[in-house]
Amino acid sequence: MEIPRGKVVAIMGLSGCGKTTTLRLIGGQLQPTKGEVRVAGQVVHELDSDGLYKLRRRMGMLFQFGALFTDMSVYDNVAFQMREHTDLPESMIRDLVLLKLHAVGLRGAHNLMPGELSGGMARRVALARAVALDPMLIMYDEPFAGLDPISLSIIGELIRTLNDALGASSIVVTHDVQESLKIVDYVYFVSEGRIIAQGTADDIKHSKEPYVHQFVWGEADGPVSFHYPTAKSYKDEILTRSARA
């Protein structure tokens, strides 16, 4: 799996297939049992704590439900990384925070608390925080989950726009196929920890791979069966009961 600089790449697949685990491997939260993960030429699991800390400063992360600090204002949420990881004066931090919030359309909401935000607004604040330090790599864990159609479209457009503006690389872990295919350059489909298909958005839409076709078009039955596996078929079970009766 390769994530080229300047590209937006989606990782798709059923729950539990290894999508979020991939993000955790990239971020150094987990170590691979075999193989290696390289970010900017560095093998992540070989870095010491200081090296990993420096590498993580160059990464941004948007968690599934934003994960904003609930006791901090919108402004302080976005300023948090700047205060923790830089020696910038507060006047410059203020300018940068308002710039990031302006980029996601929420400069006017800088004094609000997370509890005063809608789900879509909270996700946009979290996105502003994720790009606060102009990262080279931005990771998104289910960025579209639980959003209304308008907010979903806004987040998708922001992911694409901010990636292009920063010249960064973005990894989008998602189940939202149709929205993702509008913004990504490449897609990896994962099943049981393995890549089973990959290609451009157009390749994926027209894939003949049964699993990919079922996932993309939301078909109720296919390789992923509607029925949970049982020892006996329903017909055999009924016949067995009838024979006993």
Regions of interest found by a model, annotated:
Residues 138-141:
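Catalytic Walker B motif of ABC-type/P-loop ATPase nucleotide-binding domains
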Residues 113-117, 121:
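Conserved ABC ATPase signature
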Residues 134:
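Conserved catalytic motifs of ABC-family nucleotide-binding domains
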Residues 44-60, 90, 204-207:
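ABC ATPase NBD coupling module
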Residues 42-43, 90-108:
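Conserved ABC ATPase "signature" region
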Residues 27:
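Helix-to-loop junction immediately C-terminal to a conserved catalytic motif
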